[in-house]
Design a protein with these regions (language model features):
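A surface/extracellular/periplasmic glyco- and lipid-processing/surface-interacting theme
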Residues: 5, 9-42, 47-183
């Protein structure tokens, strides 16, 4: 039986920079590791009708994430909108070009393999794993910032919002459309 280890950080929605990790979704009989601890998962169709997952992590120490796979360029917008450090093991031609052109802070296992390890009990290439700690350590060595002033990732307000009920004759807080244009 597997044990899952995770530690939630003390501060809720801190200024810690998120991590986006590319995860294989064609793992056969092998289980994903760490998906349950992410803030959000993006699943997008890649070549051959398969899907790949990009998981975003923030304010959690996750000790095993994977299996980590290569980057695809169509995930980069989702990673960038959260100012995430982008973690992957290899890349497609388009992803490599876009990552370099856009200056995306990325931890690539082909060049920064200290952030990754292989589980020898699983057949390659589905056996590469990482952790949030290893990604942050490697990002610091690469002089990437590990904090952010961008509060884009799931920054919910706890302020209560009340709307009046028109059924009770209350008409405030209505949103009126003064004009509608269809083209």
């Amino acid at each position: 039986r597997r044990q899952r280890q995770m530690c939630i950080r003390d501060s809720q929605n801190s200024n810690q920079r998120p991590i986006a990790v590319m995860i294989d979704n064609n793992v056969g009989n092998n289980a994903h590791e760490g998906l349950q601890d992410s803030y959000i998962n993006y699943e997008i169709i890649v070549e051959g009708g398969l899907t790949r997952i990009m998981a975003l992590y923030k304010d959690k120490d996750v000790v095993k994430i994977g299996p980590v796979r290569s980057s695809r360029h169509y995930f980069l917008d989702f990673s960038s909108e959260s100012d995430a450090i982008y973690a992957h093991y290899g890349w497609s031609t388009y992803a490599e070009k876009d990552i370099k052109a856009l200056g995306i802070n990325n931890v690539n296992g082909l060049t920064s393999n200290s952030a990754y390890w292989r589980d020898k009990t699983i057949k390659a290439p589905h056996n590469v794993f990482t952790s949030t700690e290893k990604i942050y350590e490697t990002a610091q060595k690469m002089n990437y910032k590990t904090t952010t002033k961008d509060w884009k990732l799931l920054n919910y307000s706890v302020k209560e919002i009340t709307f009046k009920d028109p059924a009770d004759g209350e008409e405030d807080n209505r949103l009126l459309a003064n004009s509608v244009s269809l083209k």
